[in-house]
UniProtKB/Swiss-Prot annotation:
Signal peptide: none annotated. Residues 178-195 have a biased composition (Low complexity). The gene is ygiB. Residues 178-223 are annotated as: Disordered. This is UPF0441 protein YgiB. Belongs to the UPF0441 family. Residues 204-223 have a biased composition (Polar residues).
Length: 223
């Protein structure tokens, strides 16, 4: 009889443990679900300039202008920089490059090198910008400059890309799309000049990574 009692006690302990671990497992699941929500994508709109934004958002002209001007400043800080106009044009096409402000993020030694060779350094024009809500649920808007190449030989040809080379599809303003929240985070300042074709290589690598990630996600969802 004592043995039977011992067996019953063991069974009871197992049953008790199972019942009391279940809420813990549920709590862990809830934490992961919340973490997933925090990393969720957000909807952004793509505009060429402040006028496009204002036309699509009546009554938000001031916000559109502020976002556009902030995107221009961000473009000066983070856009790829080239030592010569020719290098920039080879990447982005004729009429798509401008002289970059001397204070736009480039390290002093690189500024001196570029200025010695051509009198200045060069960057692509901002082709458009993404606009979305501020991270953290603020009342204002976040923005991210976009660039595009007019050179058919470039991987960035006809596409909107950010300063890191990530591709956001066709360079057509007025679109709305869903992007990761990290897409709207500030990019690091450009501190070195890019060699000819270097930005295009970054775009090609980013596109390959995006396709690979999309394929992995599809396979995971399909089991």
């Amino acid at each position: 009889m004592k043995r039977t009692k011992s067996i019953h006690h063991a069974s009871f302990r197992k049953s008790w443990s199972a019942r009391h671990l279940t809420p813990v497992a549920l709590a862990v699941t809830a934490v992961f679900m919340l973490a997933g929500c925090e990393k969720s994508d957000e909807t952004v709109s793509l505009y060429q300039n402040a006028d496009d934004c204002s036309a699509a958002n009546p009554g938000k002209s001031a916000e559109c202008t502020t976002a556009y001007n902030n995107a221009l400043k961000e473009a000066e800080r983070t856009a790829p920089k080239y030592a010569t106009r020719e290098d920039c044009v080879a990447e982005f096409g004729e009429g798509q490059c401008q002289q970059a402000p001397a204070q736009a993020g480039l390290a002093p030694e690189n500024q001196a090198q570029a200025q010695q060779s051509s009198g200045s350094f060069w960057m692509p024009l901002m082709a458009g910008y993404m606009m979305g809500r501020l991270m953290g649920g603020g009342a204002g808007f976040a923005q991210q400059p976009l660039f595009s190449s007019k050179n058919p030989a470039s991987p960035a040809y006809g596409k909107y890309t950010d300063a890191a080379g990530k591709n956001y599809g066709a360079a057509q303003p007025g679109r709305t799309m869903t992007v990761p929240k990290t897409a709207m985070a500030p990019k690091p300042a450009t501190t070195t000049t890019v060699t000819r074709g270097g930005f295009g290589e970054s775009v090609a690598k980013q596109s390959t990574m995006q396709r690979s990630a999309a394929g992995t996600s599809t396979r995971s969802m399909g089991g």
